[in-house]
């Protein structure tokens, strides 16, 4: 249960060891690491570094020339475009990971899994209300992290953002 880094690697290892593997994930393969944490934050860092390199180019002896005339660039940060790019990169990596799992023989279920005893899982596929009960010799729970909300500082999506909301803000 869970398709983040831990669940992803466990599923691949299980198949390589000859097991029949079902991976249940409701938000996308790669989990928060790929979709809302590592990939997006590294993309933001790389974008900020690129803007800084352009801004400091003249101090390093690099001059920008347009139509034979030196120009001093104005750095303009387009946050909606940056967010769209980083979300696209995250979705692309998630899709690649899904394709890898499927190519290796993992059955991926888009849905929610709940333990039902020692050797059973109730699977509710996304968009459905009924559950299917499956039996498993081994169950790995790798459900990852969730943003912690403090009673005194609940995220409202405007003034207080959690790390999942951050990448969907506009201007």
Task: List each language-model region with its residue ranges.
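Glycine-rich Rossmann-fold phosphate-binding loop(s) that bind the pyrophosphate
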Residues: 2-5, 26-27
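Residues forming the Rossmann-fold NAD(P)(H) cofactor-binding site
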Residues: 8
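Glycine-rich flavin
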Residues: 12-19, 24-170
